[in-house]
Every structure is written in C-alpha cells, then in structure tokens.
Amino acid sequence: RIVAESAKMDLNLDSVVGDGDPIDICVLSEREIYHAGILIKCIPIGVIRMIDKGEIDDKIIAVIEGDQVYGEYRDINDCPKTVLDRIQHYLLTYKDLPGSLKPNAVISSVDGADVAKKIIKLSMQDYIESFPEHHKEYESSVAAVESLGR
C-alpha cells in the first residue's frame, strides 16, 4: 500500500494501484540460481518502474555481494547499456503469450540505487503494518538497508 502510494506520487499517476506483491527483485549474477527459498546478500543498484495491466510493478535490480562479474556495480548506471536493454526486454515480455500483439507492461522509468533503497524501505513499512509483531526485525532491517553498498 505505502509503496503504491509513493509510486503514484513519484510517477504522477492517479489511476494505478499496487500489484499486492511485497517486492520484486531481479538479481544479476555470474552464477545460476537454481531454486527459490534461499537467502542471498545483495546490493540494490536500481529499479525499473513498471506499470503492468494498470498495476504498479516495480522491479528492484540488485547484484550479489562479491559476484565476480557484477559485484562492483553500485548503481544502475554502472550496468552496460546492453545488459540493461536485455533486462528491460525480458521484463516487458516474459508474461506475454505467443502471438500476443499488445504488450501487458510498460516501463515508466529506470532509477538508481537511492530510489531502489527508498522502495525497499517503503515495502518494509508495508510489511510491518501487516505483521506488527515483527517490529524488532523491521528496525534491524532498516539499518541493514542503510548500510548496503557502502
């Protein structure tokens, strides 16, 4: 809820709502990640702000700390244009059915690490509003987000 309201203000959009997801993260790595349900220490470097079927669907872009290929990136501007173009193409098309002519999603902006960290913090606020019993974890997580990429 908080993330969606912030995006509506940031992007000057009145007619969109949040997609209900806690947060979406695309992790760049030289290594394959074979399954979900694992924890990886990542550094957010940017965000691709998207509207998908009228819903805000931001994608945080992050790198694995210490990754041999991407680990030195600290901002989306550190990505080569070809890498960023491929990520954007994937995010715009991965939900499309074969033969579909109308795209489901549009990219409204591509922003750097500062905006990504702001969105992460807002998502954490959304979480704590939904699960107030986890307030202590929230406080330590905010401090961890503040220190990322330093």
Show the residue positions of the predicted features.
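Hydrophobic N-terminal alpha-helices or hydrophobic patches in metabolic proteins across all domains
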Residues: 1-150
